[in-house]
Amino acid sequence: MNALPPAIFLMGPTAAGKTDLAIELTKVLPCELISVDSALVYRGMDIGTAKPSKTQLAEHPHRLIDILDPAQSYSAADFRSDALAAMAEITARGNIPLLVGGTMLYFKALLDGLADMPAADAQVRAQLEADAQAFGWQALHDQLAVVDPVSAARIHPNDPQRLIRALEVYRVSGMSMTAHREQQTAQSTEAAASGRQQLPYTVANLAIAPADRKVLHQRIALRFEQMLDQGFLDEVLALRSRGDLHSGLPSIRAVGYRQVWDHLDGKLTRDEMQERGIIATRQLAKRQFTWLRSWDDLHWLDSLASDNLSRALKYLGSVSILS
């Protein structure tokens, strides 16, 4: 018997069928679901995130869905803390945590831990905010591009919270956020080589996707069209009508939402919005595949196979998760 309690990771690109398989697994295994998705944490963002239906959530509850207002931010560190607490509760009941989603950074943070970043510094933050008021957020973004080009490439100039944090880390520690993360990766690699691990669970890693990438692209396009038919534009209009949300927030920068927001701002026609939304979703899937290709001990399932449940159960049995 394993010394550590079991957990299951069910990963994959967007539109691959992760939720359906996860629900099927809960019907035959003592599993409880934890969502691993940076967009599903937000309330009022249902259609564009392909959130499980209210019926599905009532019958098969998912933790870490609908836990935040769209005006709030949610970090990988927040996720790790919340997920560890949920996993402990599930394990204490004698059940298996089944973590399902496509935010690969969250899976990685949970598995390997996070770099020890310096604490917030009120004086440094005040100076950065004063600089932003005087010179604009683009000027701060230009500063970040000099000291941490990797972070600058992923942080939008209109995302003040993340922009300030990245510059704050550099000014307080003298190291970029990217350097801190690289240091953590090296430490995690060393820990794995020595048999130590950050996550106190025996994890079985499952991934699901269509074997043919063209099929996934077709599914992405169809799902985006269905979202529009289901009222995606009205959903974003409701968010805009609040008056306290803007395109720089992490929630509104989620794939699909930023394109619809730009359309409602008059920056894109409806056809352009739909095309760019589909392209952005395909790019997201490509990034997810990049993460998954480097994942150790990963068992793949084909989205189009009719026997994925039995295949998943066979694999879980083979790695002693079910013993």
From Swiss-Prot:
Sorted UniProt keywords: ATP-binding, Magnesium, Nucleotide-binding, Transferase, tRNA processing
SUPFAM superfamilies: P-loop containing nucleoside triphosphate hydrolases
Protein's recorded name: tRNA dimethylallyltransferase
Reactions this protein catalyses: adenosine(37) in tRNA + dimethylallyl diphosphate = N(6)-dimethylallyladenosine(37) in tRNA + diphosphate
Annotated binding of ATP, by residue: G12, P13, T14, A15, A16, G17, K18, T19
Residue numbers spanned by region Interaction with substrate tRNA: 37-40, 161-165
Annotated GO biological process: tRNA modification
Annotated family: Belongs to the IPP transferase family.
Residues carrying the site annotation Interaction with substrate tRNA: T103, R125
Highest rank taxon of the organism: Bacteria
Pfam assignment, any one: IPPT
Cofactor(s) needed by this chain: Mg(2+)
EC main group: transferase
GO molecular function: ATP binding; tRNA dimethylallyltransferase activity
Family annotation (HAMAP family): IPP_trans
Binding site for substrate: T14, A15, A16, G17, K18, T19
Entry function: Catalyzes the transfer of a dimethylallyl group onto the adenine at position 37 in tRNAs that read codons beginning with uridine, leading to the formation of N6-(dimethylallyl)adenosine (i(6)A).
Record flagged with keyword Chaperone: no
Assembly mode: Monomer.
